[in-house]
A protein has these predicted regions:
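A short acidic, Gly/Pro-enriched loop at the edge of an enzyme's catalytic core
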Residues: 2-12
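Substrate-binding/catalytic lobe of Class I Rossmann-like enzymes that use SAM or dcSAM, i.e.
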Residues: 55-151
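A short glycine-rich, Lys/Arg-flanked "PGG" loop and its adjoining helix->strand segment in the class I
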Residues: 24-39
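Short Gly/Pro-enriched turn/cap motifs at secondary-structure boundaries
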Residues: 152-156
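Conserved beta-strand signature within the Rossmann-like core of class I S-adenosyl-L-methionine
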Residues: 37-45, 49
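A short SAM/SAH-binding and catalytic strip from SAM-dependent methyltransferases
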Residues: 10-24
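Short hydrophobic/aromatic beta-strand or adjacent loop that forms the aromatic wall/cage
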Residues: 157-165
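Short, catalytically relevant binding-site loops at active-site mouths
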Residues: 19, 46-50, 87-89
Length: 172
């Protein structure tokens, strides 16, 4: 949707969507769409500055929080309120990981049954799988289904789940 020329809004809302848009573009566009007294609300995940060295991706996502805070100053947006809810949302990752672990048990059972009943088909499947999916991706998938790396502790370590209420210094 392209707003009509000169159309402004009381609120520009980014809920679980901000991390998918270049931050500078999103904030400048939102600021330009605000009417006098309008606000921007951002509720999303931001990266901490903690370095990550595992072959697995960090749980969570988003723009670095340090860059977001700098950008807010550069674009001249005021922080009306800022709330971190990381510890409140983190337990959902433990539930998600347990689900994947249950899926892993199911895959094991099916695989064992197929190896017993169709060994040559499973060898062929394994060969095709290893040809199509590179080792790094296979390792990540294995760790995702059987491991416990994507958990609440790692989410808290590598992320800040923030709610920002922002306003512009617009004087129109």
């Amino acid at each position: 949707m392209n707003p009509k020329k000169k159309q402004t809004f009381d609120l520009c809302l980014f809920s679980e969507s901000f991390q998918y848009i270049p931050a500078k573009i999103a904030l400048k566009k939102a600021k330009g769409l605000l009417n006098k007294g309008g606000q921007i609300l951002v509720a999303d995940c931001f990266r901490s500055d903690v370095k990550h060295s595992s072959h697995n991706r960090r749980p969570g996502g988003g723009h670095p929080l340090s860059e977001m805070l700098k950008l807010l100053k550069d674009i001249d947006l005021n922080i009306i309120s800022k709330k971190e809810i990381t510890k409140s949302v983190a337990p959902s990752l433990d539930i998600e990981q347990k689900f994947y672990n249950v899926v892993g048990v199911g895959i094991d059972k099916v695989q064992q049954g197929l190896v017993a009943s169709h060994p040559w088909k499973m060898k062929l499947f394994s060969l095709v799988y290893k040809t199509i999916v590179n080792q790094k991706k296979r390792r990540r998938l294995h760790d995702r289904i059987y491991g416990n790396i994507r958990n609440s502790d790692n989410f808290i370590k590598f992320n800040h789940y923030m709610i920002f209420q922002l306003s512009s210094n617009k004087a129109d």
